[in-house]
Protein backbone atom coordinates (compact mmCIF):
# COMPACT_ATOMS: atom_id res chain seq x y z
CA UNK A 1 0.00 0.00 0.00
CA UNK A 2 1.59 3.27 -1.23
CA UNK A 3 5.14 1.78 -1.15
CA UNK A 4 6.80 4.81 -2.76
CA UNK A 5 4.67 7.65 -1.39
CA UNK A 6 7.35 9.11 0.91
CA UNK A 7 10.31 8.83 -1.45
CA UNK A 8 11.93 11.87 -3.14
CA UNK A 9 10.85 12.18 -6.79
CA UNK A 10 14.30 11.61 -8.38
CA UNK A 11 14.96 8.57 -6.20
CA UNK A 12 11.37 7.38 -6.69
CA UNK A 13 11.81 7.19 -10.48
CA UNK A 14 15.01 5.18 -10.06
CA UNK A 15 13.29 2.77 -7.66
CA UNK A 16 10.31 2.43 -10.03
CA UNK A 17 12.63 1.46 -12.91
CA UNK A 18 14.40 -1.16 -10.81
CA UNK A 19 11.17 -2.49 -9.32
CA UNK A 20 9.55 -2.82 -12.74
CA UNK A 21 12.58 -4.73 -14.07
CA UNK A 22 12.70 -7.06 -11.05
CA UNK A 23 8.98 -7.84 -11.29
CA UNK A 24 9.15 -8.41 -15.04
CA UNK A 25 12.31 -10.55 -14.94
CA UNK A 26 11.01 -12.72 -12.10
CA UNK A 27 7.49 -12.93 -13.59
CA UNK A 28 5.92 -12.10 -10.25
CA UNK A 29 2.30 -10.99 -10.23
CA UNK A 30 2.09 -8.05 -7.85
CA UNK A 31 -0.65 -5.72 -6.69
CA UNK A 32 0.55 -2.22 -5.87
CA UNK A 33 -1.90 0.18 -4.24
CA UNK A 34 -1.28 3.83 -5.06
CA UNK A 35 -3.11 7.11 -5.55
CA UNK A 36 -0.40 8.24 -7.98
CA UNK A 37 -1.82 7.49 -11.43
CA UNK A 38 1.55 8.11 -13.13
CA UNK A 39 3.12 5.49 -10.88
CA UNK A 40 0.30 3.04 -11.67
CA UNK A 41 0.57 3.73 -15.42
CA UNK A 42 4.34 3.17 -15.36
CA UNK A 43 4.48 0.08 -13.16
CA UNK A 44 1.29 -1.67 -14.15
CA UNK A 45 0.59 -3.85 -17.15
CA UNK A 46 -3.00 -3.54 -15.89
CA UNK A 47 -4.61 -0.87 -13.72
CA UNK A 48 -7.66 -1.13 -11.56
CA UNK A 49 -9.56 1.91 -10.39
CA UNK A 50 -11.36 1.17 -7.12
CA UNK A 51 -13.76 3.79 -5.79
CA UNK A 52 -16.05 3.29 -2.79
CA UNK A 53 -14.94 -0.34 -2.53
CA UNK A 54 -16.05 -1.05 -6.11
CA UNK A 55 -13.85 -1.87 -9.11
CA UNK A 56 -14.81 0.80 -11.66
CA UNK A 57 -12.35 -0.04 -14.45
CA UNK A 58 -9.71 -2.72 -14.98
CA UNK A 59 -7.68 -2.32 -18.15
CA UNK A 60 -4.24 -1.54 -19.49
CA UNK A 61 -2.91 1.90 -18.46
CA UNK A 62 -3.40 3.41 -21.94
CA UNK A 63 -7.10 2.55 -21.95
CA UNK A 64 -7.66 3.71 -18.38
CA UNK A 65 -6.25 7.13 -19.32
CA UNK A 66 -7.54 7.57 -22.88
CA UNK A 67 -10.73 5.50 -22.71
CA UNK A 68 -12.15 5.91 -19.20
CA UNK A 69 -15.43 4.06 -18.87
CA UNK A 70 -17.21 6.42 -16.48
CA UNK A 71 -17.35 9.97 -15.20
CA UNK A 72 -16.17 8.60 -11.84
CA UNK A 73 -12.93 7.36 -13.42
CA UNK A 74 -12.46 10.69 -15.24
CA UNK A 75 -12.91 12.59 -11.97
CA UNK A 76 -10.54 10.27 -10.10
CA UNK A 77 -7.77 10.70 -12.69
CA UNK A 78 -8.41 14.48 -12.77
CA UNK A 79 -6.64 14.91 -16.11
CA UNK A 80 -9.23 16.69 -18.21
CA UNK A 81 -12.46 18.63 -18.30
CA UNK A 82 -15.97 17.41 -19.01
CA UNK A 83 -17.77 19.91 -21.22
CA UNK A 84 -21.36 19.96 -22.42
CA UNK A 85 -21.74 19.37 -26.15
CA UNK A 86 -24.38 18.34 -28.66
CA UNK A 87 -23.83 15.49 -31.12
CA UNK A 88 -24.29 16.96 -34.61
CA UNK A 89 -23.20 14.01 -36.78
CA UNK A 90 -21.66 10.53 -36.37
CA UNK A 91 -18.25 12.24 -36.25
CA UNK A 92 -18.85 15.68 -34.73
CA UNK A 93 -20.12 17.66 -31.77
CA UNK A 94 -20.81 21.31 -31.09
CA UNK A 95 -19.86 23.21 -27.93
CA UNK A 96 -20.85 26.83 -27.24
CA UNK A 97 -17.24 27.91 -26.54
CA UNK A 98 -15.11 25.58 -28.66
CA UNK A 99 -17.40 25.33 -31.67
CA UNK A 100 -17.26 22.20 -33.83
CA UNK A 101 -15.20 19.26 -32.62
CA UNK A 102 -14.60 16.29 -34.91
CA UNK A 103 -13.26 12.81 -34.29
CA UNK A 104 -14.19 9.19 -33.76
CA UNK A 105 -16.75 8.45 -31.06
CA UNK A 106 -15.86 5.50 -28.86
CA UNK A 107 -19.55 4.71 -28.58
CA UNK A 108 -22.29 6.10 -30.81
CA UNK A 109 -24.80 8.68 -29.63
CA UNK A 110 -27.93 9.74 -31.52
CA UNK A 111 -27.68 13.05 -33.37
CA UNK A 112 -29.06 15.78 -31.13
CA UNK A 113 -27.91 14.08 -27.91
CA UNK A 114 -26.58 16.34 -25.14
CA UNK A 115 -23.40 14.74 -23.82
CA UNK A 116 -20.47 15.37 -21.51
CA UNK A 117 -17.32 15.37 -23.67
CA UNK A 118 -13.95 14.62 -22.07
CA UNK A 119 -11.32 17.14 -23.19
CA UNK A 120 -7.83 16.02 -22.12
CA UNK A 121 -4.95 18.55 -21.86
CA UNK A 122 -3.32 17.10 -25.00
CA UNK A 123 -6.53 17.28 -27.10
CA UNK A 124 -6.34 21.00 -27.85
CA UNK A 125 -3.41 22.62 -29.66
CA UNK A 126 -2.00 26.10 -29.30
CA UNK A 127 -2.10 28.51 -32.26
CA UNK A 128 -1.30 32.22 -31.76
CA UNK A 129 -2.92 33.03 -35.13
CA UNK A 130 -6.27 31.44 -34.27
CA UNK A 131 -9.33 33.61 -33.73
CA UNK A 132 -10.50 31.15 -31.05
CA UNK A 133 -8.86 32.66 -27.96
CA UNK A 134 -9.34 32.19 -24.25
CA UNK A 135 -7.92 33.85 -21.15
CA UNK A 136 -4.98 32.19 -19.37
CA UNK A 137 -5.83 31.99 -15.68
CA UNK A 138 -2.97 29.70 -14.61
CA UNK A 139 0.34 28.50 -16.00
CA UNK A 140 2.32 25.59 -14.57
CA UNK A 141 5.85 24.92 -15.79
CA UNK A 142 6.56 21.17 -15.75
CA UNK A 143 10.03 21.10 -17.31
CA UNK A 144 9.24 19.57 -20.69
CA UNK A 145 5.89 21.33 -20.93
CA UNK A 146 3.58 23.98 -19.62
CA UNK A 147 0.04 23.28 -18.52
CA UNK A 148 -2.08 26.33 -19.21
CA UNK A 149 -5.52 26.60 -17.65
CA UNK A 150 -7.84 28.53 -19.93
CA UNK A 151 -11.14 30.15 -19.01
CA UNK A 152 -13.86 30.21 -21.66
CA UNK A 153 -16.72 32.74 -21.92
CA UNK A 154 -19.04 30.23 -20.20
CA UNK A 155 -16.50 29.89 -17.35
CA UNK A 156 -15.27 26.41 -18.28
CA UNK A 157 -11.69 25.76 -17.17
CA UNK A 158 -9.74 23.80 -19.77
CA UNK A 159 -6.16 22.57 -19.28
CA UNK A 160 -3.87 22.59 -22.36
CA UNK A 161 -0.35 21.12 -22.70
CA UNK A 162 2.23 23.10 -24.65
CA UNK A 163 5.82 21.95 -25.16
CA UNK A 164 8.16 24.17 -23.14
CA UNK A 165 10.39 24.91 -26.16
CA UNK A 166 7.51 26.88 -27.66
CA UNK A 167 8.84 30.37 -28.41
CA UNK A 168 5.87 32.39 -27.10
CA UNK A 169 5.15 31.62 -23.47
CA UNK A 170 1.84 33.04 -22.33
CA UNK A 171 1.35 34.80 -19.03
CA UNK A 172 -1.71 34.81 -16.78
CA UNK A 173 -4.40 37.18 -18.13
CA UNK A 174 -3.10 36.92 -21.72
CA UNK A 175 -5.19 35.50 -24.55
CA UNK A 176 -4.27 32.00 -25.76
CA UNK A 177 -5.26 30.77 -29.23
CA UNK A 178 -6.63 27.27 -29.88
CA UNK A 179 -5.99 25.68 -33.27
CA UNK A 180 -9.00 25.08 -35.50
CA UNK A 181 -10.48 22.84 -36.63
CA UNK A 182 -10.51 20.96 -33.34
CA UNK A 183 -10.06 17.23 -33.89
CA UNK A 184 -9.94 14.68 -31.07
CA UNK A 185 -8.93 11.19 -32.20
CA UNK A 186 -10.89 9.30 -29.52
CA UNK A 187 -14.06 11.13 -28.56
CA UNK A 188 -15.05 10.02 -25.06
CA UNK A 189 -18.58 11.07 -24.08
CA UNK A 190 -20.99 10.25 -21.32
Regions found by a protein language model. Name each.
Residues 1-72:
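ABC ATPase nucleotide-binding domains
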Residues 17, 71, 85, 134-135:
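Small-residue-enriched segments and motifs
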Residues 28-31, 82, 145:
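Secondary-structure boundary/capping residues
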Residues 66-90, 118:
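C-terminal boundary and immediately downstream tail of ABC-type ATPase nucleotide-binding domains
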Residues 80, 91-190:
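Non-catalytic connector elements of ABC transporters
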